[in-house]
Amino acid sequence: MNIKQILRPIYVPIVAKAKFLSLRLSQPLRIMSAEDTIDYILEHHCSIARYGDGEFNIALHDYGVVFQGYNPSLSKRLKEVLLSKNDDLLVCLPHALRDQRGLNRHAKTFWMYWSLNEYENLVRHLSAAGNQNKVYGDASITRPYKDWKRIEHAERVFAKLKLIWESRDILIVEGEQTRLGVGNDLLSNASSIKRILCPPNNAFDQYDLILDSVAKHWNGELILIALGPAATVLAADLAGHGMQALDVGHMDIEYEWMLRRSTEKEQIPGKYTNEANNDESIGECADPQYLSQIVCRILE
């Protein structure tokens, strides 16, 4: 083994971190913290459309994700929403692109190397539309547990998130086996809950049916959407029609992991957990309260 091979594990991370810091300083993005993002939602009653690495892969490249294959129409819409100028829609980017304090080592490393490959491309895309200096929300408000060193962050964020639907009627648009809020108290302070069940995979392929169903069943409720990349587009379209819609992503699973003090991304019984090994059969949910909330099923 030569000296280069010996020093490489030390040298490469140092150089990568230095380049990452240089990117952030030279082309900074204005991204609110998780708590400031929630305060903004509470004050302005706006909708949110979130972008993580999966949405970026579809929007900026010809890639798909685990539960949504690449779709050129979805890619086009994700590009459009990313550049939205609708004041009723808060576009959200990962706060880790601005500040990594408090994140665990795995999350820091992931977003550092992601940024080395994609940050300049993202900034260039935003700048072309004059959006580089726009203020963005934090896409990680629905993922406050697994990427963080301390559980206190998740406890604060979830406590504030619950204020958004305090005593409000909710319409959930979710994958068939997502079961948002079932078996825990995440939504226990809501006044009422209705559910539209959608395909667990490739939901965007049924997008028009989903959009029509929401229009049919909406009666002033706050809309919570857990539907992969399709949720980003749906939240934007609903905001354009005067509805408040929140793309909540993995919020329920993160809440379950927090309650369990999970150290790994474990399977949650009775719920589809795409980031864990889904070898177990999820099965049907016989909870009568959950079944009574379902107003529509749009399945593959």
Which residues make up each language-model segment?
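C-terminal functional extensions of proteins
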Residues: 230-300
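Conserved beta-strand scaffold positions in the cores of enzyme catalytic domains, especially
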Residues: 48, 172, 192-195, 245
